[in-house]
């Protein structure tokens, strides 16, 4: 099962057709296929459930998709060495310097020769669509990776009106107040890790394994620094880092949560996958609701 390690959350601003038949048809147009001998990369949808044919996994109003990106890896020094050899050989043979366009043509030929022997780097990115709350969660640590996946989904569906989930109260201000005033929300526990920044972004302090109620940390907050990253524990169910842009990083579900479905036999892979997906989405939905409550709700967009 794809236990999310990060969560970049987006708000769907319009309702879309998520029916299984329509979704499968749309995703099939951009299904992932392995790179051919002349392909540098491939990007498309793969099956979330091992051995299944569907390019989506659905339980109730929850949908799981998996974007698969394959890239051929050709070390630049290998290309340079082979290219230099070819350039030297041709320049000596013709007793002249090659033009820029000729060198580029040689480079393209070198790459095409090396491609069939190149290793592949594979990357899978899970997407969870909550059609009940109209939120999309992407397991990505960078906005670039998330935007690439959203672009693939938009291409597949024809339209995808989304915006990043924004809180009414700035997370940096709220996190700072939680620590400075010792007023943590009831369901959250601050862990001993944070990042502090000055308003001008010139000074950054990163602390780890250090009590956040120490005089040193509180002094920085009194002098105007804000907490931009804060490690938190949510009701002993999972830990994560809340960022000032509202994204959740380094999600780690507690063992007692991940083991809840251990009574299901390992041989029954599909049933365990189903149960774990329901469990994970339920936990993250509840966490999102709690964060919205304590960060003033969702920001109103004009």
From Swiss-Prot:
Which is a Gene Ontology cellular component entry for this protein? cytoplasm
Keyword terms: Cytoplasm, DNA recombination
Q: Which GO terms describe its molecular function?
A: double-stranded DNA binding
Compartmental location? Cytoplasm, Nucleoid
Domain of life of the source:
Bacteria
The Gene Ontology biological process terms listed for this entry are: DNA recombination; regulation of DNA recombination
| Record keyword DNA-binding present | no
Annotated InterPro entries: RdgC
* Job description of the protein: May be involved in recombination.
Similarity comment text for this entry: Belongs to the RdgC family.
Q: Which NCBIfam families did the record assign?
A: PRK00321.1-3 (NF001462), PRK00321.1-5 (NF001464)
User: What name does the UniProt record give this protein?
Assistant: Recombination-associated protein RdgC
* Gene of this entry: rdgC
């Amino acid at each position: 099962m794809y236990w999310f390690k990060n969560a970049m959350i987006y708000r769907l601003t319009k309702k879309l057709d998520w029916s299984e038949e329509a979704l499968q048809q749309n995703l099939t147009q951009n299904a992932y296929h392995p790179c051919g001998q002349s392909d540098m990369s491939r990007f498309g949808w793969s099956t979330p459930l091992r051995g299944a044919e569907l390019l989506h996994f659905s339980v109730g109003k929850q949908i799981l998709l998996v974007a698969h990106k394959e890239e051929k890896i050709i070390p630049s020094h290998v290309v340079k060495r082979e290219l230099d050899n070819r350039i030297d050989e041709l320049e000596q043979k013709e007793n002249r310097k090659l033009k820029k366009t000729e060198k580029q043509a040689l480079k393209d030929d070198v790459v095409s020769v090396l491609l069939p022997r190149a290793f592949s780097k594979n990357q899978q990115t899970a997407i969870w669509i909550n059609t009940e709350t109209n939120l999309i969660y992407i397991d990505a640590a960078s906005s670039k990776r998330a935007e690439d996946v959203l672009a693939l989904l938009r291409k597949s569906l024809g339209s995808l009106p989304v915006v990043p989930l924004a809180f009414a109260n700035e997370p940096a201000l709220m996190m700072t107040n939680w620590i400075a005033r010792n007023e943590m929300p009831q369901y959250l526990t601050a862990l001993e890790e944070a990042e502090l920044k000055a308003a001008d972004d010139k000074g950054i302090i990163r602390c780890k394994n250090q009590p956040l109620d120490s005089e040193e940390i509180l002094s920085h907050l009194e002098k105007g620094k804000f907490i931009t990253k804060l490690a938190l524990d949510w009701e002993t169910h999972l830990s994560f880092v809340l960022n000032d842009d509202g994204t959740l990083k380094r999600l780690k579900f507690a063992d007692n949560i991940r083991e809840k479905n251990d009574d299901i036999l390992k041989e029954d892979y599909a049933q365990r996958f189903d149960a774990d997906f329901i469990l994970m989405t339920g936990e993250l939905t509840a966490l999102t609701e709690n964060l919205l409550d304590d960060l003033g709700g969702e920001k109103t967009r004009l």
